[in-house]
């Protein structure tokens, strides 16, 4: 749903798939684990504008937290919730669902927006003795940003592949600000070409 034709299509979202596949190939060639997060909302999710009778992208509150009300998207078991068909999915070792609780949104792959519940991602990474992450995807200014900030808070070293990200950009500079926030918090930003070059 975040790609062309989807309910919450991110501008140029499809352009990230080629970058993702190149990064997957890079990881596989070095024996690095590839994982994905997946929005997995119930049809009555409280972040949906349709549940409140308002226009999509209207600001408001959900369970005491600031909330942008979104078009219905990534409804569990719908076509829109699936990973992109051109993504090299066989290489993905684990997929972590988020946004399953209808009462709170979940931008981060680690926690819901209220940090009341965590996904199994942190435990999985620690079980596999992974302490450094390479993050990319959709959308820069929401899921990528909050996943990266949470990962840094949890003590991971985080690298962000900037050309593998695209933003919603409700405000025109939201993605640029998100990259600045991630960098200021301790993430290292690379294009994929720079990453491949620096890693040898």
How does the language model describe each region?
Residues 130-146, 160-165:
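Glycine-rich anion-binding loop/nest that anchors nucleotide
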């Amino acid at each position: 749903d975040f790609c062309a034709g989807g309910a919450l299509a991110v501008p140029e979202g499809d352009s990230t798939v080629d970058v993702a596949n190149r990064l997957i190939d890079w990881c596989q060639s070095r024996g690095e684990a590839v994982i994905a997060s997946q929005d997995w909302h119930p049809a009555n999710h409280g972040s949906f504008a349709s549940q409140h009778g308002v226009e999509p992208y209207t600001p408001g509150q959900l369970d005491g937290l600031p909330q942008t009300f979104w078009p219905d998207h990534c409804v569990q078991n719908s076509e829109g919730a699936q990973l992109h068909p051109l993504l090299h999915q066989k290489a993905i070792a684990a997929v972590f669902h988020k946004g399953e609780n209808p009462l709170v949104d979940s931008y981060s792959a680690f926690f819901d927006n209220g940090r009341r519940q965590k996904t199994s991602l942190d435990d999985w990474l620690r079980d596999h003795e992974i302490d450094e992450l390479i993050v990319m995807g959709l959308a820069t200014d929401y899921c990528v940003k909050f996943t990266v900030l949470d990962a840094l808070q949890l003590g991971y070293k985080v690298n962000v592949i900037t050309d593998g990200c695209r933003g919603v950009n409700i405000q025109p500079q939201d993605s640029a600000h998100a990259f600045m926030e991630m960098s200021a918090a301790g993430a290292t930003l690379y294009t994929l070409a720079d990453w491949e070059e620096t890693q040898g």
